[in-house]
């Protein structure tokens, strides 16, 4: 059960904490308060919720904000240097001029956020697109009946990815459809999402309603992975099977 933390209580914690220690604020609720310009460096906020909290200019450097609920928050000019933001809910937030240098935002939800002036560096993880921004390349996906699909994403295809390893494009050529070991070949494969969407070997597949917004992950487009291993990992996760045969799939090249 989450614990409600009042502002004065939080300020006392910050005042009394040893600067060499990491303040544990996991599974807490912060509600209806102004924390603007507060020093929240080196704090563990895993699974905490911020509801109607002003957080502009807050310094979160070296903190863990994984799984934190920040929807609609004003985080303008905040520092997330070297922070972990795995699966953080940042929908509808104001991230204007936020510093993400060295931050890891894997799985963070950035839908409908204001992102003008965001600062990143070479150590920022999962902010850049996973797939090549230009040119043609090979990709992989899985379909019904444990079928593995190898795709060619053409140079003129629109492509995008959010903060996960999944990518999307508006069109692709189907190079091969096989079983997970690539020993049994098929002529076609049926999409998980749309039973009428069929990938046919040698033909182009065109997405219905491709959404160019890169921060929307579950939306229109042909979804794919950059590696066979990632595609097979996804296949195992949705099937819920950790069988020996599944292990063999990932080991086969």
Pin down the residues of each PLM region.
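Non-catalytic interaction/regulatory modules that flank or connect domains
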Residues: 130-221
């Amino acid at each position: 059960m989450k614990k409600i933390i009042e502002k004065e209580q939080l300020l006392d914690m910050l005042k009394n904490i040893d600067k060499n220690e990491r303040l544990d604020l996991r599974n807490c609720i912060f509600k209806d308060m102004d924390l603007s310009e507060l020093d929240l460096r080196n704090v563990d906020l895993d699974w905490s919720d911020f509801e109607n909290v002003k957080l502009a200019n807050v310094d979160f450097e070296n903190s863990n904000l994984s799984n934190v609920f920040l929807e609609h928050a004003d985080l303008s000019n905040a520092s997330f240097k070297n922070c972990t933001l795995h699966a953080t809910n940042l929908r509808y937030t104001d991230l204007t001029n936020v510093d993400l240098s060295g931050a890891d935002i894997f799985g963070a939800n950035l839908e409908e956020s204001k992102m003008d002036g965001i600062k990143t560096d070479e150590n920022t993880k999962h902010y850049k697109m996973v797939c090549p921004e230009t040119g043609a390349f090979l990709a992989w996906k899985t379909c019904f009946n444990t079928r593995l699909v190898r795709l060619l994403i053409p140079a003129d295809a629109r492509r995008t990815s959010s903060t996960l390893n999944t990518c999307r494009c508006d069109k692709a050529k189907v190079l091969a459809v096989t079983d997970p070991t690539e020993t049994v070949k098929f002529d076609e494969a049926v999409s998980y999402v749309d039973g009428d969407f069929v990938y046919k070997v040698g033909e182009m597949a065109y997405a219905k309603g491709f959404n160019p917004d890169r921060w929307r992950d579950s939306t229109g487009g042909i979804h794919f992975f950059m590696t066979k291993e990632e595609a097979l990992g996804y296949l195992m996760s949705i099937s819920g099977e950790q069988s020996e045969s599944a292990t063999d799939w990932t080991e086969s090249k």
